[in-house]
């Protein structure tokens, strides 16, 4: 039989859910890694030529295989690192008189830093960030780079801490018990414009709320089917597509996904339907907190402290 020779290339994708088609049609860059051999470079150039039919050549980057593989992991690790970094600062902002949004804007105007992924929140999710960071940490451990592994592990640890901290804020704000109280959760997808719930912060938040014997009512425009699967083993959880129905007789409302529809809800109507005092916990900092406080809400946000009528 005639022998078959082939080359293995690395061509990591950098697509984001919700913008995958546009990311493919007009990517920031395409990265192709090939072996540094004659046949490896021929194979690499073949794939370059395919991409060059619709992508400008200057956006097509080439490297060796290891560089391409690590670039994928490092890209997601750096993005997640920014989220965990600003979330770490959000805790300090709450302890002082700082506003994390103002801090993020101030540092984001520095051209060396930029403004993307500097929005404090309940945490990052999705199928890639945690997986890729843990992969990076594992590689570091494999090569005996323990300090580097611990550094990247801390990005994940900080994210999980932020989710737990959000639940503790709810508990402490509501007089240290939520047993028997109805808590409406708006948003379950890990981010807006997708029904994907993989590694969504809402999973751990809702499970912790339920473990405190709260009655949790979850609403989301696209993710309810996945939410039911993710929380199949949890008790005390209900699902309601209509956000206005979800908040009826609720003692608290928590925003966990930055859906645009939540920015335009009638919050006077929501306040009127809730038990009093009506608590609102904005885990994505997407609402007008001053306006909500004027309506009558007890407002708690990430990195901004609280606006309350109870003091």
What are these regions (language model features)?
Residues 1-311:
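Structural/interface elements that position substrates and couple domains in central-metabolism enzymes
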